[in-house]
Amino acid sequence: LKTDSRKVQSGDAFIALAGARTPAEHYMDQAISAGATAILLESEQERQCHERHGALIVPVVGLRARLGRIADRFFEHPSRHLRVIGVTGTNGKTSVTQYISQLLRETGTPCGLLGTLGYGMPGSIESATHTTPDVVQVNRVLNRIRNEGGRAAVMEVSSHALDQGRVDNLTMTGAVFTNLTRDHLDYHGSMEAYGEAKARLFLREELHFSVINFDDPFGRQLYGQLEGQCDRVRYSLHEAQTELWLKEFTPTASGFRARVDGQWGEFDLAVPLLGSFNASNVLAALATVLTLGVPVERAVSIVRELSPPPGRLERFTGSTGKHVVVDYAHTPDALANALEALRPHIRGRLICVFGCGGDRDPGKRPEMAKEAEKRADYVIVTDDNPRTEQPCSCASCPPVSSGT
């Protein structure tokens, strides 16, 4: 079952949906040429099934809205056979997803991944095209995870995915909220609409528990909204009355030491990750696996071995002893967090090299410039995937100048 006509092989069934500027019939003809034997065709009105060049054409009214049910049934309900955890938030999704997966795997639960860094089980990860793929591909990957021995799957769930139905009809065990800061306003139009999209992940009837960052204003709002819906677990860097909170934090050259308290008791952590925001990410992952029943002592021992995802405060050291840290930070909040995170770990100058993507929200460019100027000793502005914009415009020289 395919949704991309370029990937159709002989004998496949193809789902033909209209694109932004391209009718569904165009993709249908491509799929038939590639050997598709059946086509589910998006249709505005009821029509009879018919054949076209040897392929069965099945017109379906409201096909896009039915994709979740179709994919779930086609792949024999894979999410029902796994503990599926969805992670959403502006920042931290990739790190939290990776940490949950590492903790589950090392404590005896084979766990797959879906997110920015790829889809599948460790050792057979396929490249990602989206943070959250379409609902057919989500079910295909979950089915592969199940067939390869997985018992759990942790997935990044973007606001686009929630708005576009890419996780419809999945059976989810838990959901994690990291934070909500400015991003994707070119798509959602307002922070209110952006927050509403995120909240959909937590309003699912089948959800057993939610893990919520109680330091985030929207997280507090979400926590209140979910009263009586599912078990709620709060984590915090400051609030002592939450289920898991950071009592002490000490930066070290290679990471940090922490003392944590809450409903699972008080315990110490040694974490090989940079930054206080990674303390928040680790708390989110710990709260999730402890809620799933992993023993505290076992989880604490595995935290010592956590490794950051590629491009998430990833440290490189050359022969001169100088440190270079690469981070994915692509929002003002994420850039501020990354720069602040590094300060306690360094003695010399902090030089920031950043850029903004072309054809994306231009409003955040001067805001990112302000954060860089405020927190770094020296700032270099470049472009970051200009897309259709001119590189100099994409580097946002005039907007960045106005921001600083």
Where are these regions (language model features)?
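N-terminal leader/targeting and accessory segments in enzymes
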Residues: 1-69, 217, 245-248, 274, ...
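Acidic, Mg2+-coordinating active-site environments of NTP-dependent enzymes
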Residues: 45-50, 148, 163, 172-324, ...
